[in-house]
Regions:
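RNase H-like DDE/DDD metal-dependent nuclease/strand-transfer catalytic core used by mobile genetic elements
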Residues: 1-11, 15-124, 128-129
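C-terminal, beta-rich DNA-binding module of retroviral/retroelements integrases
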Residues: 131-187
Length: 187
């Protein structure tokens, strides 16, 4: 972006159909991440399992490191099971890392954007193009949208376009998963 505007992008992909949704955000604050995640779920549908990295914003806060964070609460309240990969192991998120590279090369490197609003519009347009035209071998050479049409998946969507108001209450049910690395010498 012109002027050196700092931004982050929450990229989400469906591992079965390869559909993707990107949502640029100005900060990594919980409110921004919850809003971006909600926006991607409104476009892609609610996943059964949501694999994410162990970034602090997804599971908690520095102030209360053992408390259940707002993103984790949001997932559980919507019936989504978060699956946290180990810290500092991005290769465990290979699908999203590949999409991040694709997004960087095909959108950011080729498009001159003047402000944050243009970035958001360009990201939504990129997602639409990606989902309707890009072909993957894992989808049998068809676009992500066509892979969805051919699947028997029934999509669930959030109950409204607006994300819930924070702070979220602690859910009484649901489960989440933590993947950890165990060395062969068991240390």
């Amino acid at each position: 972006l012109r002027g050196g505007t700092r931004f982050y992008v929450l990229n989400t992909t469906d591992v079965v159909t390869a559909r993707a949704a990107s949502m640029p955000i100005g900060t990594r604050a919980t409110e921004s991440v919850v809003g971006a995640l909600w926006s991607t779920w409104c476009r892609l549908g609610l996943p059964q399992v949501f694999q994410i990295d162990n970034d602090l914003v997804f599971w908690g806060s520095r102030r209360y490191p053992r408390a259940m964070g707002q993103v984790l609460r949001l997932c559980l309240m919507q019936g989504v099971e978060p699956l946290f990969i180990p810290p500092a192991e991005p290769w465990r998120n290979g699908i999203i890392e590949k999409f991040n590279d694709h997004w960087q090369q095909k959108l950011l490197a080729r498009t001159q954007l003047n402000d944050f609003d243009q970035l958001v519009s360009a990201a939504v347009a990129f997602d639409a193009k990606h989902n309707s035209r890009w072909r993957y071998s894992k989808t049998g050479g068809v676009s992500p949208n066509e892979a969805l049409r051919r699947s028997s998946a029934e999509l669930r969507f959030p109950p409204s376009e607006q994300p819930p108001t924070l702070p979220l209450r602690r859910p009484s049910e649901g489960r989440y998963h933590l993947v950890r690395f165990i060395r062969s010498d068991r240390v």
